[in-house]
C-alpha cells in the first residue's frame, strides 16, 4: 500500500530534516527527484512548484480532512489541473523507456487523476480515460483504499463510472 502523495519524497525530506533542521529543503527535494524520477524530475518538480505557488497565492492548503471540492476555486481549478496533466504527460514520456520509472511517475500522478475525477473535469470521454488510468495505476501500485481509508479503489472506480 502506498503511503499517500509523494510518500517517498516526504520520508526522504523528514530524514534530512531530522539530521539537520536548517538544511536546504529545496536542494534535497531536487536531489531526491533527480535520483528517484530521473528524466521525469523536471516536470514533477514543476508540478510541485505550481501546486505550492497556487496554494500560496490563495492562502489555501489541502489537508487530510478536506477534499478536492475545497480547492476547486484555488489550486485545483480546471485550468490548473489541465496544466498538471500536461506536466505529467511530459514526465511520463520522459521515462517511458523504463517500466519502474514510469510507474513511479504515474504513482505521483494519482492525486491529480483523483482530483479531476472527483471534480468531474473534462468531457465524458476524458473522464472515462482518467477513471481507467486511475484504476490501472492504483492496481499496479497495490493501492487498496482512497479518501483516508473511507472507500476501496474498486468502489471509487465503480462510483465514478456511475456518475459519467
Predicted segments, located by residue:
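Histidine/acidic-residue-rich catalytic or RNA/ligand-binding cores of hydrolases
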Residues: 4-14
Amino acid at each position: 500500500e502506498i503511503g499517500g502523495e509523494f510518500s517517498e519524497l516526504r520520508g526522504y525530506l523528514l530524514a534530512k530534516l531530522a539530521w539537520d533542521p536548517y538544511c536546504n529543503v529545496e536542494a534535497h527535494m531536487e536531489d531526491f527527484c533527480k535520483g528517484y524520477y530521473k528524466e521525469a524530475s523536471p516536470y514533477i518538480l514543476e508540478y510541485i512548484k505550481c501546486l505550492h505557488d497556487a496554494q500560496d497565492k490563495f492562502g489555501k492548503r489541502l489537508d487530510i480532512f478536506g477534499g478536492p471540492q475545497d480547492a476547486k476555486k484555488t489550486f485545483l481549478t480546471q485550468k490548473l489541473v489541465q496544466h498538471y496533466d500536461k506536466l505529467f504527460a511530459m514526465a511520463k514520456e520522459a521515462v517511458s523507456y523504463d517500466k519502474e520509472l514510469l510507474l513511479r511517475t504515474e504513482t505521483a500522478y494519482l492525486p491529480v487523476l483523483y482530483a479531476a475525477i472527483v471534480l468531474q473535469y473534462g468531457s465524458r470521454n476524458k473522464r472515462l480515460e482518467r477513471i481507467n488510468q486511475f484504476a490501472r495505476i492504483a492496481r499496479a501500485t497495490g493501492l487498496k483504499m482512497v479518501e483516508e481509508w473511507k472507500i476501496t479503489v474498486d468502489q471509487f472506480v465503480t462510483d465514478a463510472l456511475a456518475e459519467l
